[in-house]
């Protein structure tokens, strides 16, 4: 008898089905439509992701979305926490990706606590660049409070990565992305992070963020159990090609990629989680249940999240 088919879980969702979660005063109907669309793609649990912005704006967004979450049982069930990606990222071009340089700053525990309070204590994942001063202390404090710390949008040295791991960092966000188009041949951030078996790598299986052969190489290089899959989806996911927003950024979804017009860097993805499972199974040579585990139980276990069984119908 086959194992029960569980919901997928995505730890990095910036928007979906034409809805941009970065929008201030996001309408309740839009958020409900987005989570309904996610569930149609077999994804009943997500970490809703907010990206870099001014601290006051992030606090307002968290407080507003948390009010919507509390007021709607379907939203509350689907949005089981938040992922904060910025403003504690690298300000260097290339490493910051589409995140604005002007708002990046050293990790600040009091600022994080303000955002955590606004989010009702549900920020469960924070992505940061550990080269900022005070990063190790910050990681130690937030991980002791139950928040998972992930390294991303970073050009940290080996010693800075080592300090972050010893402080409690356990993930790396969209490994192979959030980096410049050109890197040194050997000593680069992808290799530095990949070399650390303590870190679980989050990978985006859309064929754009990582070509299939790169996805295979990264998957093979990590120890068993040290890879998770995510979409980094934004509002263009489960929506037609065209113009969309990612917060204050205007982007274009075309040919399976989302970019700022005139820029080479990616700005999230238009991948849906169920398509990500199909891609992973095909490109990594996995059985369906093995690919689903990377997008469900294995990821959810990092956050103590129990996934529901999908209705066979």
Language model features with spans:
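Divalent metal-binding pocket/active-site signature
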Residues: 84, 91-188
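Residue-level marker for buried hydrophobic side chains located in beta-strands
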Residues: 7-9, 82, 150, 227-230
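Short helix-capping segments at alpha-helix termini
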Residues: 70-77, 119-121, 144-146, 222-223, ...
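Di-metal (Zn2+ and/or Mg2+/Mn2+) metal-binding site signature of metallo-dependent hydrolases
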Residues: 3-24
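Divalent metal-dependent hydrolysis catalytic cores, especially in the metallo-beta-lactamase
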Residues: 13-20, 32-61, 77-90, 119-131, ...
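Active-site-adjacent C-terminal substructures of enzyme catalytic domains
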Residues: 138, 160-292, 302-306
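Catalytic metal-binding/acid-base residues of hydrolase active sites
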Residues: 14, 89, 154-155, 207, ...
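Metal-dependent catalytic neighborhoods of phosphoester/phosphodiester hydrolases
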Residues: 56-67, 95
């Amino acid at each position: 008898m086959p194992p029960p088919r569980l919901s997928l879980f995505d730890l990095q969702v910036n928007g979906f089905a034409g809805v941009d979660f970065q929008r201030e005063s996001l309408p309740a109907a839009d958020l409900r439509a987005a989570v309904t669309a996610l569930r149609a793609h077999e994804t009943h649990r997500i970490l809703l992701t907010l990206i870099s912005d001014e601290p006051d704006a992030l606090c307002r967004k968290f407080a507003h979305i948390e009010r919507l979450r509390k007021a709607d049982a379907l939203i509350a069930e689907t949005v089981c926490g938040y992922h904060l990606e910025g403003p504690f990222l690298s300000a260097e071009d290339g490493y910051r990706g589409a995140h604005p340089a002007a708002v990046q700053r050293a990790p600040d525990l009091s600022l994080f606590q303000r955002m955590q309070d606004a989010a009702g204590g549900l920020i469960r994942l924070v992505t940061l660049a550990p080269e900022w001063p005070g990063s190790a202390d910050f990681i130690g404090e937030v991980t002791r409070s139950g928040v998972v710390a992930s390294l991303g949008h970073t050009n940290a040295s080996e010693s800075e990565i080592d300090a972050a791991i010893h402080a409690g960092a356990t993930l790396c966000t969209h490994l192979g992305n959030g980096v410049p188009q050109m890197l040194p041949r050997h000593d680069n951030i992808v290799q530095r992070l990949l070399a650390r078996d303590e870190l679980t790598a989050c990978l985006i299986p859309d064929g754009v963020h990582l070509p299939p052969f790169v996805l295979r190489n990264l998957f093979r290089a990590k120890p068993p159990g040290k890879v998770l899959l995510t979409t980094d989806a934004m509002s263009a996911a489960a929506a037609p090609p065209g113009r969309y927003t990612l917060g204050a950024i205007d982007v274009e979804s075309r040919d399976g990629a989302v970019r700022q017009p005139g820029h080479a860097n990616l700005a999230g993805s238009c991948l849906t989680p169920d398509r990500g499972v199909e891609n992973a199974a095909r490109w990594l040579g996995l059985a369906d249940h093995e690919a689903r585990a990377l997008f469900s139980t294995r990821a959810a276990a990092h956050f103590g999240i129990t996934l529901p069984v999908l209705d066979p119908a």
